[in-house]
Amino acid sequence: QFVRDARIAQLYEGTNGIQALDLVGRKLPMHNGRLLRSFFHEVKEYIEENAFNYNLKEVIPHLMKSFGRLQQATAFIASKGLSDPEEGAGPATDYLKMFALTSLAYVWVKYIDISNRKMNDDPKGFYKAKIATGTFFLNKVLPETGALMSSIMSGASSYTKYEDDFFESSFS
C-alpha cells in the first residue's frame, strides 16, 4: 500500500506540473490569449450582473477578490514569460492551482445562487447543504489564492538559482 501510494504521489505531482506548464506555455498565449480572455469575460460579466444580488452578498466578494488575483497573476506570468520562458514556467504550478480554485469558486457561487432560488422546494435540505458547502469553500479554501499570489509574484528565481549540485551536497 505504501509503495503504491508513493508511486501515485509521483505521478500526481508530475502530471500537475505538466498540465501547469501546458497552461502557461501553450494555452495562455494561444490565439493571443483569446482562450483565457473568453473565460475571464464570462466570470467578469457574471460578477457585474450579480454584484448587488442579495442572495450572494456573503460570497460574491470572495469570488471578486480571487478573480482579481487571477487576472493580476495572468498578466504577470504573460509579461514575464514573453521575455524569459523560465520566468513564466517557474510559477506555473501555483498558477494552475489558483486558476482551479478561482474556477471552482465561480461554479460554487453559481450553485449558491441557484440553491437560494430553490430553497422553498427543499424538503430534504439538499439546497441548504449546497449553500453551506459552497460557503465553506469560499470562506476556508479559496483564501489560499492569497498565498499562491505571493508565490507567483516572487517569480522563478527560487527555482532558477537552485543548482543541481545543491541536491547532492544536501545528502553528503
Question: What do these predicted regions represent?
Answer:
Residues 5, 9-19, 30-34, 38-43, ...:
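Structured mid-domain segments that build the active-site/substrate or prosthetic-cofactor binding neighborhood
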